[in-house]
């Protein structure tokens, strides 16, 4: 099979990377279901995985534990594979309040959600890429295990148009309406179509820039063009065929909807009898009214609010069967990479239970039929049985990953840069704050940064206040600070706006700060979740990207977790030093641009570029939008869209195109903020 992935990098594998790459590839070729890449912080695990993807030549899912790390991986993979389909699949909700009922106060909470249109477009683009090509890398969060439209129904609903086909104009419009596209002859936006005589323009839901024009003559498809919806410029002329994908993943053919309605009616009869027999008259009246309304909507429009609660019938699955998810779109020979697996794996297991308890209340009190319980994320057992060949990636793999992998663990301890793991010291608790202050003074003079981790939010606030009183430039992180502000705080730390960052459990996975030379762990001898072996190794690893990396553990005794973490760090350090000595390597500090943490990858060389997008105007800085809040970004996007349409109406297309390119930049930034 010819290679479909093209890895673009100025580096070649070094350190432990070549050995790890070969071991993982051999495992995949021999059919191993589970492997683990145990890679220390800063050892280039992402580059190793990129090489494995390129060599294995298979469609790949990479699952990350949160949106921040998913965005970071998306940016890195876009740079490694500029000519391949690197897609982003995370939850498209900016805000989500699920349907719920609180029996104690008799309070029903309606579902309320705000959908991020740009991320919705990226999700649709991801499934389209999986259906059309093999050179696909999907960066996903745990939302990938939640129910998605059935791929068979999705494929059946696609509209194929070929040049020379005999198609009635009204039939095309009817099919577009079935795909949930909206006709709008005035404002032409994504997910809309417009009609001008026998010319039909469609703006595909999964497309960011390009629209399709279908020209008919006497019910024959005469010409198919791709054009820029803003300027009207034709980009590709006279295509032989085109495929229009549904506007949403949750579309269903008419005959399936009618079948589902009959099954819903049957279930409603059974449920009403159960409630009447239990003398639950209010619940019986409630479920009858709500379900009848949904049935009417589905009959007339083909969908209803909360249609996902009938997914069992719409996807043709039996009671208790797993819902269709993104994994159903992945080819049989696909590859799954689970990043930071010690966190991600446990998240996968937790999703089902939380969702179940909320829905049981809705069913019991007559807000939903029992079949709504099958609208759920996958159970962990279902995920495990459905997952393709899997590689777990972590500096501290969990018990599950190690058990599943057995002896198939690829160690990546030696860094390409020759950097060693931090030196660890244990110091008494009694003088920890004053001792820490003196260590901070030493780092301030050198222009280095310090991370401090405490046990409670109150402790972090008090410590930050104490350090500030002693003229230390300090900030603290805790769970109340949202993702965007957290990224900005980390960026300010790297830029030297302040020198010390105090936190609780946030200074761990994916925190890439080469300027940090000291990690201080207060009350390290308090055994528990925050001071477990895995947590300690992860936290110590934050200083592993600096030549002067050092970790101080404050404790009056050495706990089992401390002992194991110190032993493992020292073992790695000895192995790294031996490799450096053997190969004559001098350790080199990392020099990573500060802006990198917020970048989401460069556009592919295939994508249509515009000179106005590439060149910054006079006095326009590249990072203009980096520090804007999500609300400010949204307002700026709305302002620019209004300006763009006004310019287009005034026939000032060059200026309108500049505004469009600015909107594109803002939307890329918005992914990180969502």
UniProtKB/Swiss-Prot annotation:
<dbReference type="InterPro" id="IPR006935">
    <property type="entry name" value="Helicase/UvrB_N"/>
</dbReference>
<dbReference type="InterPro" id="IPR027417">
    <property type="entry name" value="P-loop_NTPase"/>
</dbReference>
<dbReference type="InterPro" id="IPR036876">
    <property type="entry name" value="UVR_dom_sf"/>
</dbReference>
<protein>
    <recommendedName>
        <fullName>UvrABC system protein B</fullName>
    </recommendedName>
</protein>
<comment type="subunit">
    <text>Forms a heterotetramer with UvrA during the search for lesions. Interacts with UvrC in an incision complex.</text>
</comment>
<dbReference type="InterPro" id="IPR001943">
    <property type="entry name" value="UVR_dom"/>
</dbReference>
<dbReference type="GO" id="GO:0009432">
    <property type="term" value="P:SOS response"/>
</dbReference>
<dbReference type="Pfam" id="PF00271">
    <property type="entry name" value="Helicase_C"/>
</dbReference>
<feature type="domain" description="Helicase C-terminal">
    <location>
        <begin position="432"/>
        <end position="586"/>
    </location>
</feature>
<dbReference type="GO" id="GO:0005737">
    <property type="term" value="C:cytoplasm"/>
</dbReference>
<feature type="short sequence motif" description="Beta-hairpin">
    <location>
        <begin position="92"/>
        <end position="115"/>
    </location>
</feature>
<dbReference type="InterPro" id="IPR004807">
    <property type="entry name" value="UvrB"/>
</dbReference>
<dbReference type="GO" id="GO:0003677">
    <property type="term" value="F:DNA binding"/>
</dbReference>
<dbReference type="InterPro" id="IPR001650">
    <property type="entry name" value="Helicase_C-like"/>
</dbReference>
<keyword id="KW-0227">DNA damage</keyword>
<dbReference type="GO" id="GO:0006289">
    <property type="term" value="P:nucleotide-excision repair"/>
</dbReference>
<feature type="binding site">
    <location>
        <begin position="39"/>
        <end position="46"/>
    </location>
    <ligand>
        <name>ATP</name>
    </ligand>
</feature>
<keyword id="KW-0267">Excision nuclease</keyword>
<dbReference type="InterPro" id="IPR041471">
    <property type="entry name" value="UvrB_inter"/>
</dbReference>
<dbReference type="GO" id="GO:0016887">
    <property type="term" value="F:ATP hydrolysis activity"/>
</dbReference>
<comment type="function">
    <text>The UvrABC repair system catalyzes the recognition and processing of DNA lesions. A damage recognition complex composed of 2 UvrA and 2 UvrB subunits scans DNA for abnormalities. Upon binding of the UvrA(2)B(2) complex to a putative damaged site, the DNA wraps around one UvrB monomer. DNA wrap is dependent on ATP binding by UvrB and probably causes local melting of the DNA helix, facilitating insertion of UvrB beta-hairpin between the DNA strands. Then UvrB probes one DNA strand for the presence of a lesion.</text>
</comment>
<dbReference type="GO" id="GO:0005524">
    <property type="term" value="F:ATP binding"/>
</dbReference>
<dbReference type="Pfam" id="PF12344">
    <property type="entry name" value="UvrB"/>
</dbReference>
<keyword id="KW-0963">Cytoplasm</keyword>
<keyword id="KW-0228">DNA excision</keyword>
<dbReference type="GO" id="GO:0009381">
    <property type="term" value="F:excinuclease ABC activity"/>
</dbReference>
<keyword id="KW-0067">ATP-binding</keyword>
<dbReference type="InterPro" id="IPR024759">
    <property type="entry name" value="UvrB_YAD/RRR_dom"/>
</dbReference>
<keyword id="KW-0547">Nucleotide-binding</keyword>
<keyword id="KW-0234">DNA repair</keyword>
<comment type="similarity">
    <text>Belongs to the UvrB family.</text>
</comment>
<dbReference type="Pfam" id="PF17757">
    <property type="entry name" value="UvrB_inter"/>
</dbReference>
<feature type="domain" description="UVR">
    <location>
        <begin position="634"/>
        <end position="669"/>
    </location>
</feature>
<keyword id="KW-0742">SOS response</keyword>
<dbReference type="InterPro" id="IPR014001">
    <property type="entry name" value="Helicase_ATP-bd"/>
</dbReference>
<dbReference type="Pfam" id="PF02151">
    <property type="entry name" value="UVR"/>
</dbReference>
<feature type="domain" description="Helicase ATP-binding">
    <location>
        <begin position="26"/>
        <end position="414"/>
    </location>
</feature>
<dbReference type="Pfam" id="PF04851">
    <property type="entry name" value="ResIII"/>
</dbReference>
<dbReference type="GO" id="GO:0009380">
    <property type="term" value="C:excinuclease repair complex"/>
</dbReference>
């Amino acid at each position: 099979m010819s290679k479909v992935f093209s890895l673009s990098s100025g580096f070649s594998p070094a350190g432990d990377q070549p050995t790890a790459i070969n071991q993982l590839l051999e495992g995949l070729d021999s059919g191993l279901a589970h492997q683990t890449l145990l890679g220390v912080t800063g050892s280039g695990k992402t580059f190793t995985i990129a090489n494995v993807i390129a060599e294995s030549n298979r469609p790949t899912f990479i699952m990350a534990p949160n949106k921040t790390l998913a965005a970071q991986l998306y940016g890195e993979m876009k740079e490694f594979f500029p000519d391949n389909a690197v897609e982003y699949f995370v939850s498209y909700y900016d805000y989500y309040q699920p349907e719920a009922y609180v029996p104690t106060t008799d309070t029903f909470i309606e579902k309320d959600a705000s959908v991020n249109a740009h991320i919705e477009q990226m999700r649709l683009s991801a499934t389209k890429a999986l259906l059309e090509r093999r050179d696909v890398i999907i960066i996903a969060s745990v939302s990938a295990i939640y129910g998605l439209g059935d791929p068979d129904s999705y494929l059946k609903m696609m509209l194929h148009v070929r040049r020379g086909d005999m198609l009635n104009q009204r039939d095309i419009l009817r099919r577009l309406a079935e795909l949930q596209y909206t006709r709008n002859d005035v404002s032409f936006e994504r997910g809309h179509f417009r009609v001008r005589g026998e010319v039909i323009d469609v703006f595909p839901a999964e497309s960011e820039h390009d629209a399709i024009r279908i020209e008919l003559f006497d019910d024959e498809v005469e010409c198919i063009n791709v054009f820029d919806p803003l300027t009207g410029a034709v980009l590709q002329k006279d295509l032989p065929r085109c495929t229009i994908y549904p506007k949403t993943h949750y579309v269903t053919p008419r005959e399936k909807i009618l079948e589902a309605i009959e099954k819903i009616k049957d279930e409603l009869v059974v449920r009403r009898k159960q409630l009447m027999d239990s003398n639950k008259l209010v619940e019986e009246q409630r479920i009858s009214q709500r379900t009848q309304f949904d049935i009417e909507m589905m009959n007339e429009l083909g969908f209803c609010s909360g249609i996902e609660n009938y997914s069992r019938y719409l996807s043709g699955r039996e009671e208790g069967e797993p819902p269709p998810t993104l994994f159903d779109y992945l080819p049989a020979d696909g590859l799954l990479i689970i990043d930071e697996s010690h966190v991600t794996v446990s998240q996968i297991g937790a999703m089902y239970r939380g969702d179940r308890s909320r829905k049981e209340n809705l069913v019991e009190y007559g807000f939903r039929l029992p079949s709504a319980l099958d609208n759920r994320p996958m159970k962990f057992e279902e995920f495990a049985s459905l997952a393709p060949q899997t590689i777990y990636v972590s500096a501290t793999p969990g018990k599950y990953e190690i058990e599943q992998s057995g002896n198939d663990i690829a160690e990546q301890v030696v860094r390409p840069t020759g950097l060693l793991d931090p030196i660890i010291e244990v110091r008494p608790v009694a003088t920890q704050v004053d001792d820490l202050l003196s260590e901070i003074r030493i780092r301030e003079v050198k222009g280095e940064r310090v991370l401090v981790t405490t046990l409670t939010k109150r402790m972090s606030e008090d410590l930050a206040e104490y350090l500030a009183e002693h003229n230390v430039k300090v900030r603290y992180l805790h769970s109340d600070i949202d993702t965007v502000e957290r990224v900005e705080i980390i960026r300010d730390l790297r830029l030297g706006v302040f020198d010390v960052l105090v936190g609780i459990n946030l200074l761990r996975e994916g925190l890439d700060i080469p300027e940090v030379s000291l990690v201080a762990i207060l009350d390290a001898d308090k055994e528990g979740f925050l001071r477990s072996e895995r947590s300690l190794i992860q936290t110590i690893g934050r200083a592993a990207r600096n030549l002067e990396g050092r970790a101080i553990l404050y404790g009056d005794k050495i706990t089992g977790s401390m002992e194991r973490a110190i032993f493992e760090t020292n073992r790695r350090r000895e192995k790294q030093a031996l490799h450096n000595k053997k190969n004559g390597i001098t350790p080199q500090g990392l020099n990573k641009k500060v802006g990198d943490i917020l970048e989401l990858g460069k556009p592919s060389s295939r994508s249509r570029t515009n000179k106005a997008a590439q060149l910054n105007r006079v006095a326009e800085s590249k990072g203009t939008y980096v520090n804007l809040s999500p609300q400010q970004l949204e307002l700026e996007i709305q302002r620019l869209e209004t300006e763009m349409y006004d310019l287009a109406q005034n026939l000032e297309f060059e200026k309108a195109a500049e505004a469009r390119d600015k909107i594109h930049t803002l939307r890329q930034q918005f992914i990180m903020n969502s």
